[in-house]
Amino acid sequence: MVALSCRDALVWSLTPGQAGDGPEGRQLIEAIGVQDAPVYLLMDSAYGGNDLRASALERNLQPIVPSHPQRKLPWPLDKQRYRQRNEVERLFRRIKAYRRVFTRYDKLDVVYAAFVSMALILEHLR
């Protein structure tokens, strides 16, 4: 999920539980498209690969992600901006407050995705 704030999701997708974060993150960044002005992209350390970072920079997105501790040449991290990443985590918590999303009753992906979309819309309108 790419979110603008603790209430607004920009783009999201549904993946299997065993799917890796890197390839999906690349697809989400591609879905955002190229931005006119630089936009800060607060990311989890799971998205800290060179390919994903380069893909974000090509689209005028400034990735704010900590580099791996073993990395020889760590990239700079804006710690003040990275602290704002908890807003996205709060959005996940709010979505999971909807019982149907949290318990995953639905067998079909499209039905589950519809309820996640509904939860995102309700959170945006709140």
Task: Explain the meaning of each model-derived region.
Residues 1, 32, 56:
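Anionic-ligand binding region
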Residues 1-2, 7, 25, 44, ...:
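Mobile genetic element proteins and their domesticated derivatives, centered on retroelements
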Residues 12-35, 40:
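Active-site beta-loop-alpha junctions of metal-dependent nucleic acid enzymes
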Residues 6-14, 125:
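Short, well-ordered strand-loop elements centered on a beta-strand within folded domains, enriched
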Residues 115-126:
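Charged phosphate-binding loop/patch that engages nucleotide di/tri-phosphates or the phosphate backbone
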Residues 18, 37-41, 45-108:
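Helix-centered, glycine/charged polyanion-binding patches within enzymatic domains
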Residues 7-8, 23-30, 50, 54:
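Internal, well-ordered alpha-helical scaffold/interface segments
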